[in-house]
Amino acid sequence: MLNNLRARLLSLKFRAIRRAVIILIAKIPKDLERAITFGDALNHFLMISPFRPLFKFSVPKNIKVNVHDLTFDSPIISASFKDDVSSLFQWQLIGIGGITYKTVLKMPSKGNLRPRIQEVSHDGNYAILNSLGLPTKGVMKFLPQINNKKLTKFNRPIGISIGGNSFEEYLSVFSEIDHHLNTIDFSQFFYEINISCPNTDDGKCLSDDLESLKNLIIKFRDISSRMIVVKVSPDITNEEVLKVCEILSNLSKTAINIGNTKYVKASDVGLSQKTFSKEGGGLSGKSLYANTLRMVKLVASNYDLPIIATGGVSSYDNVKELLDNGASLTGMATLLVSDPFQIPLINYRLSNE
């Protein structure tokens, strides 16, 4: 009960401080990324300060989830949108079951021009629209970060999201990372293949060519025995998602992540060219949940395949409903940046079902 009270108090303080930071830093000119940068710096300070024990919550032992050869301490994992160690460390400290690094490309990229991430309202719900465009330090600068002891000491699965602008780039990045993983002791890694990103310039996705996707995953499986997750877009059709599942079901140690952010025009959520550099971007938030649940039911009723349900998951009720309908894990993004201290509260309720 004391842990619950502490989580609730931290939740209130976090939301108040976050709102104050956004008002003071991100409103004029409107650019949420400035508040995010400030928040990341503040979080880094807290994670190396004497206050760090305040953020530590034990995870109930009876909510572990086994997916292939990996054991997740909680069915809640982070979606692939961050790679700074302090954030990933904090989320594990508060009780997340596993983490996923944001998408890695072969070469460094600054992504799209700012402003490229904003708070919006969609269908009456809080949401975030981003057109980051996959900013990345590149695979060679990413490799030394992988075996960070602050993250591996939790002994929870760590996902690595892999992207590419071509078949060859996906294969090159995967090969470089897998070769590096074979040189380190920590073994709880898995791969997430990002075949759909709604805010890149050419708009092309590997999901548009399922034969190439099949050939790519076969090559991945020839290289590595680690679990391979394919992340699909919420805009994918029923027929397409079932075809992806068919490919995965014929290979060992695979899973599907449903799904990514949803493409929305900036003007449809009240943003102008001054407040958003691209015509549209990827929407995350509560309004995605109904479609996430629908897709989980579709996949679970047709294939015996581990499912990670990502998109609009924002409460215990969401997590419970997804798990009850066939999801193995639930991925979170917006909740982790808006109120991460809901995680220990959700874990507690899951343990007392």
Each predicted region: which residue ranges?
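Alpha/beta catalytic cores of nucleotide-metabolism and tRNA/nucleoside-modifying enzymes
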Residues: 1-56, 283-304, 308, 314-353
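N-terminal capping/small domains of soluble enzymes
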Residues: 2-155, 346
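Glycine/Thr-rich beta-alpha phosphate-binding loop at enzyme active sites
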Residues: 47-57, 195-208, 241-301, 305, ...
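Catalytic cores of alpha/beta
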Residues: 85-91, 172-176, 236-250, 300-303, ...
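Glycine-rich phosphate-binding active-site loops on the catalytic face of alpha/beta enzymes
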Residues: 95-107, 190, 195-197, 255-262, ...
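C-terminal helical cap(s) of enzyme catalytic domains, especially alpha/beta-barrels
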Residues: 111-125, 265-281, 323, 329, ...
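Active-site beta->alpha loop and helix N-cap motifs at the rims of alpha/beta catalytic domains
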Residues: 117, 121, 125-192, 197-204
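Alpha-helix-loop-beta-strand connector modules within alpha/beta enzyme cores
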Residues: 122, 127, 137-156, 210-230, ...
